[in-house]
């Protein structure tokens, strides 16, 4: 006799659907963070201090929100913010752009 096909566990199917939604949401957040970070670095390389600092603050805000919602670990978020700020500051100093009022200390 042919064996019956095993039934699906409904809770497992629901958890899988939830994980797929969560994955897309987390991926979008991380992508936005990376995009803004790259844009801030690019503007800093061009010596556009005002715009670079503005974009950097937006990226910093998104990083904090991602850490709050457990998309990023809090230490990973702190590391990303630190590296971004250091990179932007170094590039702006190299370009000779003023850092006053930007929130970047030496």
Curated annotation (Swiss-Prot):
GO cellular component: small ribosomal subunit
GO MF, one annotated term: structural constituent of ribosome
Record-level GO BP terms: translation
Cross-referenced InterPro entries: Ribosomal_bS20, Ribosomal_bS20_sf
Keywords, sorted A to Z: Ribonucleoprotein, Ribosomal protein, RNA-binding, rRNA-binding
Pfam family name, one: Ribosomal_S20p
Highest rank taxon of the organism: Bacteria
Keyword RNA-binding annotated: yes
SUPFAM superfamilies: Ribosomal protein S20
Protein family per UniProt: Belongs to the bacterial ribosomal protein bS20 family.
Protein known as: Small ribosomal subunit protein bS20
Organism the protein comes from: Thermus thermophilus (strain ATCC BAA-163 / DSM 7039 / HB27)
Gene: rpsT
